[in-house]
From Swiss-Prot:
Name of the protein: Small ribosomal subunit protein uS10
Subunit structure: Part of the 30S ribosomal subunit.
Membrane-spanning segments: none
Gene name of the record: rpsJ
Family: Belongs to the universal ribosomal protein uS10 family.
Function according to Swiss-Prot or TrEMBL: Involved in the binding of tRNA to the ribosomes.
Matching Gene3D superfamilies: Ribosomal protein S10 domain
Organism domain of life: Bacteria
């Protein structure tokens, strides 16, 4: 797999779980002899929801909820077949969304 790059984007609502997953990926890639760039923190997405507190009236009384999506980017440069196998066998938490591009 010469001159190839694997780009991994991680998304999660909790940044601690996200950082632990990124560390696991970087550690397993370095252990198999690949060069790793990252984890690079990407901008956090902040979604704000405003709802009326009461079911019928009092429109001035509102409540706001926010949802933050934390993101990280990891580039694995010149991966070996061992690197790909190690990444496939890696067990990561279910709260982390993983997007892999070759």
């Amino acid at each position: 797999m010469a001159n190839q790059k694997i780009r991994i984007r991680l998304k999660a609502y909790e940044h601690r779980v996200l950082d632990e997953s990124a560390d696991k990926i970087v550690e397993s890639a370095k252990r198999t002899g690949a060069q790793v760039s990252g984890p690079i923190p990407l901008p956090t997405e902040r979604t704000l929801y405003t709802v009326i507190r009461s079911p019928h009236k009092f429109k001035k009384s509102r409540e706001q909820f926010e949802m933050r999506t934390h993101k990280r980017l990891i580039d694995i440069i010149d991966p070996t077949p061992k690197t790909v196998d190690a990444l496939m066998k890696l067990d990561l938490p279910s709260g982390v969304d993983i997007e892999i591009k070759l």
